[in-house]
Amino acid sequence: MKEDFLKYQAQTSPYPLAMEVSHAKGSYIYDTNGKKYLDFVAGVSACSLGHQHPRVNQAIKDQLDKYSHVMVYGEYAQNPAVEFCKLLAHYMPEPLKKTYLVNSGTEATEGALKLARRVTGRSQFISCHNAYHGNTMGSMSVMGFEERKQAFRPLLPDVDFITFNNEEDIAKITTKTAAIILESIQGGAGFIQPENGFLTKVKERCEEVGALLIIDEIQPGFGRTGKLFGFENYNVIPDVVIMGKGMGGGMPVGAFTAKSAYMDLLSDNPKLGHITTFGGHPVIAAACLATLREITETDLISQTLVKEKLFRELLVHPLIKEVRGKGLMLAAMVETPEITNEVIFKCQDKGLILFWLLFEGRAIRITPPLTISEEEIKEGCAIILEALEEMYHKK
């Protein structure tokens, strides 16, 4: 299979891991040789309830027995999408009550950027250095990492960048700014949390000049940080929230939410101002509804912080300089990218899946399913420490 994978399926890098997957269950993935791997990555924060969660699987099967795709988004009332948006509105702060469903996080970013221009009539966007909001042309334009963008320029004009947590840079938000887009916790940059009320101060500046605050919850959202949404940790209510990854329990989905008066602008002058064929797909929406119910009806969110504490207690080693992040959005920081690479490959050989972050080579991604058990955390951390010990004594 690996040969065909490389020959027929377009790749994202010259050296993919190319594990041949047989099946997955709970916190484990199994390859075609029968080897079992503990998953500390969760499909890059997407499989929030682990693999083959019974509630999500049953919701998908039940919906498949009724109907699948029947019409483009926004024309027919379909129960899974309606019920999901209704439940999401219940958990969103006022006035964020209307949601547009799309197929991925980057689509959600694109929709939010269009919405900001439509609401404000302005063209400028502000983002942060080392920010990541997706990889299509609009979302790439607000990506804060030039090395990944240069080959695709020209991108959107009138985009400026500030440094995350730099209060002086907030003054760059002006009456020309349509929106500033921020991750509630910077992901690709190394799981960096906002400090000293940074998000609140950004929102205050936006209100002063009439700009919108778009908060990217694609990775932090749906319980990963100890709150349903990351922004809830920082005493701020955004104007637009963008979502993806964990909201579908492993299924492909994205969404953006804002107040009704803003969202209604996308349906008139012009009509069909934002459209999608498969957004709100009933099978995917059923998975989203089951996922949101499971996250909010159990103790998964509160347990996220308990599990974070356990990770921090266990991941102590001379080669680990710091553990960054919040909840189950964690990164073990080491001195060099070479150490990161060696740890990831050693751990995979030992049956533990780890991964990289986009823009911070010294970070080892630890984003397991929210459902991971304490015993599984101990099992995985023991493997990490074993790999680090081998490297440490080899020095």
PLM ranges: what are they?
Residues M1-K395:
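Conserved N-terminal phosphate-binding loop of PLP-dependent enzymes in the Aspartate aminotransferase
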